[in-house]
Curated annotation (Swiss-Prot):
IGPS catalyzes the conversion of PRFAR and glutamine to IGP, AICAR and glutamate. The HisF subunit catalyzes the cyclization activity that produces IGP and AICAR from PRFAR using the ammonia provided by the HisH subunit. This is Imidazole glycerol phosphate synthase subunit HisF. One of its GO terms (cellular component) is cytoplasm. Belongs to the HisA/HisF family. It catalyses: 5-[(5-phospho-1-deoxy-D-ribulos-1-ylimino)methylamino]-1-(5-phospho-beta-D-ribosyl)imidazole-4-carboxamide + L-glutamine = D-erythro-1-(imidazol-4-yl)glycerol 3-phosphate + 5-amino-1-(5-phospho-beta-D-ribosyl)imidazole-4-carboxamide + L-glutamate + H(+).
């Protein structure tokens, strides 16, 4: 049985780590390299770095810190933000990232997924889906890194997840925007709905506030990993303690000694 992954998320803006609530009102958390080292040493299974200003501002993320992170940590990490081409992705992977993640650019031009998969393989290509419950239904949103530039698309998350898989992506991160930063728990029903319609790994994002939320998302859905930010940044949850509790609840996880 594959172990379930615990994945701290570091939202990056202007080369520092920030965190908002429901993708808004971001506060500065700290230094990218120091936090990456902290979470790697604590036993995280992967890290995800989102340059949240890159896509809304139509720029490529800053890659100057990627190589340094690759030197400092010994776990896989994924980089996202402003990736619009094979060339953008290659620059990031060449600096030492293990995966790249696309979101808004893939919505604007879905063929980008096919091109990235052809060039680098499915194992390197993650697609983020920002899903928001609006007027009684879930819709995929675009350019969510900026409040005044966020766009609600006509796509529903299940249909888009199916297309993402059909184009060869190796993994989906489902960001439940209504839960983001409020620490009320993952949206188990929505996660189940999307995950049950695809066969590639799905990572839960948005809502973690306590250890029980991680236990619940692994017990009551078939997702492969749980991404979180605030609970780790604010030292609400320590990763070693979280993993011990998952182990006690018969959830397969990698224990770092």
């Amino acid at each position: 049985m594959l172990t379930k992954r615990i994945i701290p998320c570091l939202d990056v803006k202007d080369d520092v780590v920030v965190k908002g609530v429901k993708f808004r009102n971001h506060r500065i958390i700290g230094d990218i390299i120091e936090l990456a080292q902290k979470y790697s040493d604590a036993g995280a299974d992967e890290l995800v770095f989102y340059d949240i200003g890159a896509s809304p501002d139509n720029k490529l993320l800053s890659i100057k810190w990627i190589q340094e992170i690759a030197k400092k940590i010994n776990i896989p990490f994924c980089v996202a933000g402003g990736i619009k081409s094979v060339e953008n992705a290659r620059a990031i992977l060449n600096e030492g990232a293990d995966k790249i993640s696309v979101n808004s650019a893939a919505l604007a031009r879905p063929d980008l997924i096919d091109e990235l998969v052809y060039e680098f393989g499915s194992q390197c290509v993650v697609v983020g889906i920002d899903s928001k419950f609006i007027d009684g239904e879930f819709k995929v949103c675009q350019y969510t890194g900026s409040a005044d530039k966020t766009v609600q698309t006509l796509l529903d998350p299940v249909s888009w997840a199916k297309e993402v898989e059909s184009r060869g992506a190796g993994e989906i991160v489902l960001n439940c925007m209504n839960q983001d930063g409020v620490k009320g728990g993952y949206d188990l029903e929505h996660l189940r709905e999307v995950q049950s319609n695809v066969s590639i790994p799905v990572i839960a994002s948005g809502g973690a506030g306590e250890i029980q939320h991680f236990i619940d998302v692994f017990k009551y859905t078939e997702i492969d990993g749980a991404l979180a930010a605030s609970v780790f940044h604010d030292d609400i949850i320590a990763i070693p303690e979280l993993k011990q509790e998952l182990f006690k609840n018969n959830i397969p996880t990698r224990i770092v000694k």
